[in-house]
């Protein structure tokens, strides 16, 4: 036995039916009978996630890139080892020993967080704020009667949930190199540049959430001292290197040599003699040197640097792993409700 379904098929004359009113009733039924009964369970799960984030429990997590110091002396690879401690949205202790072969001739450098200082994990804090806002919206929806208001606010809750999941996976641009301007290093360690800076190098530190883990990135950066490439415009915060790179992008009809010449930079031939001469003349540079500066040079913490060594380590945070699983499950459930609500609302707005 088979059944054929005919959309919008009605008993009796079509003019006796009001499609708009029927669609509104259908959307209202969907809200009252399907979505609202699920809200208490959804609210409970969001509350548990927020409770985990706000917990005062202390988590001590090891930090290591897995290369022993003895082995490191043989293969000359960067190493890091230590412990990071989190309580709620704050890092309350951070103690690591770092070694970069090209920094201070491979000497081990110890970073110990200032006693009594708490470093705010901005992503963590934003997720907590989002979850609080989601809970407020969902509690309002439990008593909402207007169909359009319900659908609109449900959509806002979904946007906040999606953004929370993005924050767990990837840090915002302003928290990573070079836009972060060594924020974590300056916030966590008193007089940090006495430890992380040498005559020719500077160390950079990032501490973010990435792929549901606490991620630490350490960079050994070479200072660019050649003028005018190292100069920073005090008004714009952009370096000469940034300006030339931007001009090369916008004026593709010009050669790099011509652009450099227009900006007062002498381009020398790549011979040994000229290379030696150019190293003593601040404005003179060979074309390969200029290309290297444009390719690798970045403005960082009010100076121009080039990365020469990097370490990336992550440590599993049980709270982040658990919350990520719960939020993804909530997203699947709420996305299904949202799709049905949007489809039903579109019918109700069509006359």
Curated annotation (Swiss-Prot):
Pfam families per record: Rogdi_lz
Cytoplasm as UniProt keyword: yes
Compartment(s) of residence: Cytoplasm; Early endosome membrane
Keywords: Cytoplasm, Endosome, Membrane, Protein transport, Transport
One GO-annotated biological process of the protein: vacuolar proton-transporting V-type ATPase complex assembly
Protein origin, superkingdom: Eukaryota
Key word Cytoplasm present: yes
Residues that span the membrane, as ranges: none
Quaternary structure note: Component of the RAVE complex composed of RAV1, RAV2 and CBF3D/SKP1. Within the complex, it interacts directly with RAV1 and CBF3D. Interacts with the V-ATPase V1 subunits VMA1, VMA2 and VMA8.
Comment field (misc): Present with 2860 molecules/cell in log phase SD medium.
Known function: Component of the RAVE complex, which is required for stable assembly of the vacuolar ATPase complex V-ATPase under many conditions. May be required for transport between the early endosome and the late endosome/prevacuolar compartment (PVC).
Protein name: Regulator of V-ATPase in vacuolar membrane protein 2
Species this chain originates from: Saccharomyces cerevisiae (strain ATCC 204508 / S288c) (Baker's yeast)
Organismal lineage: Eukaryota, Fungi, Dikarya, Ascomycota, Saccharomycotina
């Amino acid at each position: 036995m088979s059944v054929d379904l005919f959309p919008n098929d009605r008993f009796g004359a079509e003019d006796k039916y009001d499609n708009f009113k029927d669609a509104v009733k259908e959307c209202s039924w969907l809200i009252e009978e399907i979505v609202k009964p699920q809200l208490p369970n959804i609210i409970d799960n969001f509350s548990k996630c927020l409770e985990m984030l706000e917990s005062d429990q202390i988590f001590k997590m090891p930090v290591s890139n897995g290369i022993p110091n003895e082995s490191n002396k043989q293969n000359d690879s960067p190493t890091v080892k230590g412990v990071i401690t989190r309580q709620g949205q704050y890092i309350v202790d951070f103690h690591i020993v770092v070694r970069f072969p090209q920094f201070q001739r491979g000497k081990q450098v110890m970073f110990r967080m200032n006693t009594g200082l708490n470093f705010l994990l901005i992503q963590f804090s934003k997720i907590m704020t989002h979850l609080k806002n989601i809970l407020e919206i969902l509690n309002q929806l439990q008593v909402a009667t207007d169909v359009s208001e319900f659908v609109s606010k449900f959509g806002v809750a979904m946007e906040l949930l999606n953004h929370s999941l993005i924050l767990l996976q990837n840090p915002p641009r302003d928290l990573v190199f070079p836009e972060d301007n060594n924020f974590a290093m300056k916030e966590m360690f008193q007089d940090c540049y006495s430890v992380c800076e040498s005559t020719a190098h500077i160390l950079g530190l990032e501490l973010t959430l990435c792929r549901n883990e606490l991620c630490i990135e350490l960079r050994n950066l070479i200072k660019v001292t050649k003028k005018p490439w190292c100069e920073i415009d005090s008004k714009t915060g952009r370096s000469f290197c940034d300006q030339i790179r931007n001009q090369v992008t916008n004026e593709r009809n010009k050669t790099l040599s011509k652009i450099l010449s227009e900006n007062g930079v002498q381009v020398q031939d790549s011979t040994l003699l000229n290379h030696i001469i150019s190293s003593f003349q601040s404005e003179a540079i060979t074309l390969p040197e200029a290309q290297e500066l444009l390719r690798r040079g970045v403005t960082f913490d009010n100076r121009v640097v080039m990365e020469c060594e990097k370490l990336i380590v992550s440590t599993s945070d049980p709270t982040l792993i658990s919350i990520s699983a719960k939020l993804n499950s909530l997203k699947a459930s709420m996305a299904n409700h949202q799709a049905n609500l949007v489809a039903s609302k579109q019918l109700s707005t069509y006359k």
